[in-house]
Design a protein with these regions (language model features):
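Radical SAM enzyme [4Fe-4S]-AdoMet core and its adjacent flexible, acidic
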Residues: 5, 10-11, 158-161, 166-286, ...
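Residues that scaffold the ATP/ADP-binding catalytic core of kinase and kinase-like folds
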Residues: 55, 59, 105, 158, ...
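Conserved alpha-helical substructure of the radical SAM core
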Residues: 3-12, 20-99, 103-123
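Electropositive phosphate-/nucleotide-binding environments in soluble metabolic enzymes
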Residues: 46, 76, 166-169, 199, ...
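A short, flexible beta-alpha/helix-coil linker loop
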Residues: 63-67, 155-157, 223-226, 321
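Glycine-centered loop/turn positions within well-structured domains
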Residues: 54, 157-158, 295, 321
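Radical SAM enzyme core and accessory elements
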Residues: 1-34, 274-284, 293-375
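Radical SAM/AdoMet-radical enzyme domain recognition
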Residues: 76, 80-97, 101, 105-219
Length: 375
């Protein structure tokens, strides 16, 4: 099977035949996070730490990374101010807390409580590996966390340990149950399949999730590993994921509008072994995120702020804008607004580039790994 790693025809608000707008943001635009291609960022991904307690093979080397010094990471007060500007001045409507692993930040509960007090209606979710979540889930819920996405790539200790380089499967499973008990739902599970490692577990993972009324989302591995070991061959593509699941289940595409959501969702029915036909009952849903083979860049609504306060308009951005440095220099909120707007205005069309995709010779893997950006 050949997968074209290009960018599909973009459904943008402006006339793409004219090329992108000038790289300087024109005067008179609304006070929103707009870019040259007509997209508006309303979904903020905020990394609260670069540290992590796992060493996933598709993310970082076995010996870990050089962590940021404590003084380089945003304080709780700085986070409150930056999020406040995003929500109150720039049209941010959703906030996702990321890492590294956010649970390793000691004041995480206090950070979320402060954000909730200032923004009572803001959906605040978190992406986590789940290690230690069972001990903090209730406190996080009480502080104002809405829901969680938990990364889980295998249900087998040996495979899990191979992928994460840590024997913590039991801790992650306890974290899943803790999140469910605390009401941090809907709980979603993110899984990355690696060829020859855990790809044959796809049906088992889905069965496990369906039994717990959890939405499982399979994500194509992206070239964001610190050791730069990503290859097209090693990536399990969306069509392959669909085929792996179809041996045991019938997947029926959810026709509802995705509205910028990355996952293509499917209703799941059991496949009868004898007839191959679908059963009459929908068991739940599964999502497939084809971030490489079928990218959704044209509908992207995300703006990212790293743990040290750098704005990244895209996971693959080659440019970063130092929002925290400007804040610490004594800048007024109006100056921070302008920098953030300028940073998003030059957001590339797709995968860090304006014209081509991951299959292009122009593509350059960013210096940051996923753990240093925030998922």
């Amino acid at each position: 099977m050949t997968i074209q790693l290009g960018i599909p025809v973009l459904r943008l608000a402006r006339n793409n035949s004219q090329g992108p707008a000038p790289t300087s943001r024109p005067a008179g635009l609304p006070s929103k996070l707009l870019d040259r291609f007509g997209r508006q960022a309303t979904d903020m991904r905020l990394s609260v730490t670069d540290k992590c307690n796992l060493r996933c093979t598709y993310c970082m080397p076995a010996d870990g990374m050089q962590w940021l010094p404590k003084e380089a990471v945003m304080t709780a007060g700085e986070i409150e101010r930056i999020v406040g500007i995003g929500v109150e001045r720039l049209g941010v409507r959703e906030l996702r807390i990321t890492g590294g692993e956010p649970l390793v930040r000691p004041d995480l509960v206090e950070v979320i409580a402060t954000l909730r007090a200032r923004h009572p209606e803001l959906p605040i979710s978190m992406t986590t590996n789940g290690v230690g979540l069972d001990k903090k889930a209730e406190a996080l819920k009480e502080a104002g966390l809405t829901r969680v996405n938990i990364s889980l790539d295998s249900l087998h200790e040996e495979v899990f340990s191979q992928l994460t380089r840590r024997p913590f499967l039991g801790k992650v499973l306890a974290g899943v149950e803790g999140a469910r008990a605390a009401g941090l739902g809907p709980v979603k599970i993110n899984a990355v399949l690696m060829r020859g490692v855990n790809d044959q577990e796809a049906p088992e993972l889905l069965e496990w999730a369906l039994q717990r009324d959890i939405e499982l989302r399979f994500i194509e591995q992206m070239p964001l590993d610190a050791q730069r070991g990503w290859t097209e061959h090693g990536m399990i593509t969306a069509p392959e994921i669909h085929a792996l699941l179809s041996a045991a289940f019938v997947l029926e595409r959810d026709r509802r509008q995705r509205d910028g959501a990355p996952a293509e969702r499917f209703d799941v029915r059991r496949r009868h072994a004898a007839s191959g036909e679908a059963s009459g009952t929908v068991l739940g849903t599964v999502g497939i995120i084809a971030s490489v083979s079928e990218p959704f860049c044209s509908d992207c609504r995300r703006t990212r702020v790293t743990a040290e306060g750098k704005i990244m308009s895209c996971l693959f951005s080659r440019e970063e804008f130092d929002l925290l440095g400007l804040l610490r220099s004594g800048a007024h909120d109006d100056e921070l607004v302008r920098l953030w707007q300028d940073a998003m205005w030059v957001k590339p069309r797709a995968h860090g580039m304006d014209h081509t995709g991951l299959g292009s010779e122009e593509f350059i893997q960013p210096d940051r790994s996923m753990s240093a950006i925030g998922g």
